[in-house]
């Protein structure tokens, strides 16, 4: 685990962005960049904070997810905000799929507790990765 280092130079902006994220607003590239710079200069750290603030909208972005999606052994590109934004867009497209609701329900039943739609997709990716099932 990485020790948290906060850069509070843009404290007011960071608080405003986090409040926006909490109220179901999808934040933009510049806002994610400000959060990234404030939290260890880490997109992974920023995504984790966003996920804990609003798990319905923000998924965690980490090396395991990046490697699964890109099929790369390296994490070169994990810090690219566009990659994270595209990941969130992709998750939202999956959630909109007419068949997703029944799959989401099956995951609830399997785990014996409710998860967010984003978390259900993460669980599927984790299991596919563990079982070496391709992402396509």
Predicted regions and their residues:
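Catalytic Zn2+-binding segment of zinc metalloproteases
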Residues: 52-59
